[in-house]
Amino acid sequence: MTRKLRVCGAALLTVGAMVLRCATALAAESSACDRECLHGVMDQYLAALVAHQPEQIKTTADVKFTENTNRMKLGDGLWQTIGSLGTFKLYIEDPQSEQVAFYGTVKENGATALLGVRLKQHAQRLSEIETFVIRQASGVHGTFDNLTTVPAEWDQSVPDAERSTREQLRHDANQYFNGIEQGNGKIVPFAEDCLRIENGAQTAPTIATASRPSMSAGAQFDTHMFDYIHEITNRRFLLTDPERGLVYAVVMFQHPGNIKPQLNSVAATAAGAAPRTFSLSSYPNTTQIIETFQVRGGKIHRIFAYVSLLPYRQSPGW
């Protein structure tokens, strides 16, 4: 009799454990933040930012907040000076990692600035807040006022047959940075129509001028015009969205200042192009890039980036 009671008790404990596991799984599933939820999390953050009310944000006890790589108290920095949000709003959501990123514009004391935000959520509270503010007086190129509406292509789903895995998306983005370092566009899976926008300005394909021809992104790499970028460090591939073919990365371009860019392709020479002098190649500096790639059918079709200028070898803060 005693043995039967023990067996029965053990069975009940097993069933109880199974019920507990199921309840835990259901609770986790119900608290998971999907694409729409993450979009809302970002909107709540932006609304609090514009209202200058950081107390509206639910954070973990050990939340980390940075602006332009500098760690600071939530409520400092742009929280003090922002006026309003612009109309350009590009969102990247990654439910698997519970992260959402945002590219937009803001008004700050009457001037247009670029705003990038990355949020990571844990247990329905923000645990990571990484922000980027690029101001027109900061010495970087760009046409900020070009950014008014997000092209529809960024919100289109990739057909199942043309989708890449999360690992493939990160690999393709990493090859882009390898191609810059090596001066080799052939190792990067560029689509023929690849379009690159940096700080609101179209940088690939370039627009032909009297001193240089129009060049695709891959052709630019082959000319070694980016040799002044000695290395690309602290590569972080933080969000991936296979449904839309997006991968979001944050990297640091290191410019030692003693390497001059050259245009040495046959096409460039034939068109009478001369070596170019980039201001960023004239002195030691670092640029932090937040860059999103759109990949379809294994090819990079679109690249969107915000570029900020920092002191040489500045820590990324993460």
Describe these PLM feature segments.
Residues 1-12, 20:
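Bacterial N-terminal signal peptides that target proteins for export
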Residues 21, 25-318:
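C-terminal and inter-domain tail/linker signature
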